[in-house]
A protein has these predicted regions:
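Solvent-exposed loop/turn segments at secondary-structure junctions
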Residues: 91-93, 135, 164-167, 206-209, ...
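A structural preference for short, hydrophobic beta-strand core positions in alpha/beta folds
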Residues: 50-54, 202, 318, 366
């Protein structure tokens, strides 16, 4: 029997617990209402389990709040022939223990071997970020199902990466035909996350990656380069701007967006983005950047965004790529802002970047990825290394959190199951970085995402995600398969000539 994520300590004992006989779950009056509701869902999911208030039954599932467990989600679980006891100092710890027991019951044929588990996560904050701004916005049904599955994997945060896919009242031009989430949708997701002990953290890019707004003429006045720019990476002309000009008018626009968006969330944190302001210093702010330096101009506007969010009662998270380009700038950051260190390739210098943040006393998360985007089938070898390297570096330098990113670059062509391996691996790496689930990965996918109904499909998902390893030719942040299918046919990419027919066959 495998558990996802694997527990820190698990010891077997003699005897077995019969899982076919009726198994009462004791819900006493002292349990918080949210946990009692979770118990009701637990009983509905497991046929032999039923709810009772009687604490004197000889065989039962008992939940105990005790102050002996360090850490908010630390818990112990003990199984004997007479039942199960789950103990924690917090209701969230009891909920995580129920998640472990649920996985055990779903895998048991008729009984579970007696054992004792003692568990605590490596990272206090363990989240998933879903990209809902690159051509795919999941339905509410899909998002709710994912929330339940993420809770099963013991994630406790969720972010929905948003550029233009929220239905802001005064900005229909931006979100028309984009299937945006409405305010009522966010409230529904907030309630579902809260019920499953997940913090729904608002994520609204507020500086760069604003192209879905700035392409429209009525927003050109906010653009650093309203008539477009030459992309510094590709050298290709971009027809419209992607970065806000760092002005009071831009700040006022963002303030109005925050006023409508942030009150929908219970979280006191907001991810304001800030990554990849490609054309900053090439247009409106060119002279200022020449005088003061681009990093200083960037930091000034970033700090103003953080001050704005603070006035609205929110702490901020921001992508750390720009400040890491100039480590001396780390001393100029707001003390209550959290840097998000992102990198998606195996071998990304998480260790070095985490050390820089730690030395500057900047709170930070590590943010690896599922390696699903630009891939078609996934990149399992890269994802595994990337996710575990981030966890190792983050743990070494006391990162405050771990965020698994699932992007949709260039059209979001990957299907959702391509991301499943990364979700399972990320849960394992962030809860128990010393563990490995690589050999049982398909079992975890089948258990959590396919309800144990499709082991062959789970095997195929894992097999397909290993396809890129068969090709010697490598491309960064993508696969050959993806690039051969989606490329501008007038000009063959340089790397395509390196692929032999033998490799393709």
């Amino acid at each position: 029997m495998k558990l996802f994520p694997p527990p820190k300590v698990s010891r077997t004992a003699t005897g077995r617990l019969d899982t076919l006989a009726p198994l009462p779950l004791v819900v006493h009056q002292g349990l918080p209402r949210r946990l009692r509701n979770a118990c009701t869902r637990f009983a509905a999911r497991h046929e032999a389990v039923f709810i009772t208030t009687r604490a004197d039954l000889p065989r039962a599932i008992q939940l105990k709040l005790s102050g002996k467990h360090p850490g908010d989600e630390a818990h112990s679980l003990k199984i004997t022939p007479n039942g199960v006891s789950i103990t924690s100092s917090s209701e969230s710890g009891l909920f995580r223990g129920l998640s472990t027991l649920s996985q055990m019951l779903r895998q048991a044929k008729s009984s579970i071997r007696c054992c004792e588990i003692k568990d605590v996560p490596d990272f206090a904050n363990r989240g998933v970020m879903l990209d809902i701004s690159r051509c795919k916005v999941p339905t509410l049904t899909t998002l709710k199902t994912l929330i339940e599955q993420f809770a099963d994997l013991k994630y406790n945060q969720l972010q929905l990466y948003t550029e233009h896919t929220f239905a802001f009242t005064d900005h229909e031009t931006v979100w028309r035909d984009a299937s945006p989430l409405a305010a009522s949708d966010i409230l529904e997701l907030q309630a579902h996350c809260q019920a499953h002990y997940i913090e729904l953290v608002p994520n609204l890019n507020s500086f760069g990656h604003f192209e879905r707004w700035l392409r429209h003429s009525e927003y050109h006045a906010y653009a650093e380069c309203p008539d477009g720019f030459i992309h510094p990476l590709s050298g290709k002309p971009m027809p419209h701007g992607s970065t806000l000009r760092p002005t009071a008018a831009s700040l006022d626009l963002v303030s109005r967006l925050y006023d409508e968006y942030l009150p929908l969330f219970d979280s006191k944190t907001v991810n304001i983005g800030g990554d990849e302001p490609w054309e900053l210093g090439l247009g409106y702010s060119r002279r200022r950047c020449e005088r003061e330096g681009k990093t200083k101009v960037y930091l000034d506007f970033l700090n103003r965004l953080q001050t704005l969010a603070k006035k609205k009662g929110r702490r901020t998270q921001f992508w750390g790529d720009i400040v890491l380009e100039d480590p001396a700038s780390l001393t100029q950051l707001s003390t209550d802002a959290t840097a998000m260190i992102w990198g998606y390739e195996a071998g990304h210098p998480f260790e070095h970047q985490c050390a820089l943040m730690a030395e500057a006393n900047v709170p930070f998360y590590v943010c690896p990825g599922t390696s699903s985007w630009n891939s078609l089938t996934g990149r399992l070898d890269n994802a595994t290394k990337n996710l575990y390297e981030a966890a190792s570096a983050g743990a070494n330098h006391r990162a405050t959190g771990y965020l698994v990113t699932d992007w949709g670059d260039h059209g979001h062509h990957q299907t959702l199951p391509v991301s499943y391996p990364g979700f399972v691996l990320g849960a394992s790496a962030s809860w128990n970085a010393a563990s490995s689930v690589s050999r049982s990965l398909s079992q975890g996918i089948n258990l959590v995402f396919l309800d144990r109904q499709a082991p062959a499909l789970a095997d195929r998902i894992v097999t397909m995600s290993r396809f890129p390893q068969l090709i010697k030719t490598k491309v960064v942040n993508a696969t050959v398969f993806n690039h051969l299918l989606f490329w501008r046919m007038r000009h063959a990419p340089n790397w395509s000539s390196r692929i032999s027919n033998v490799e393709l066959e």
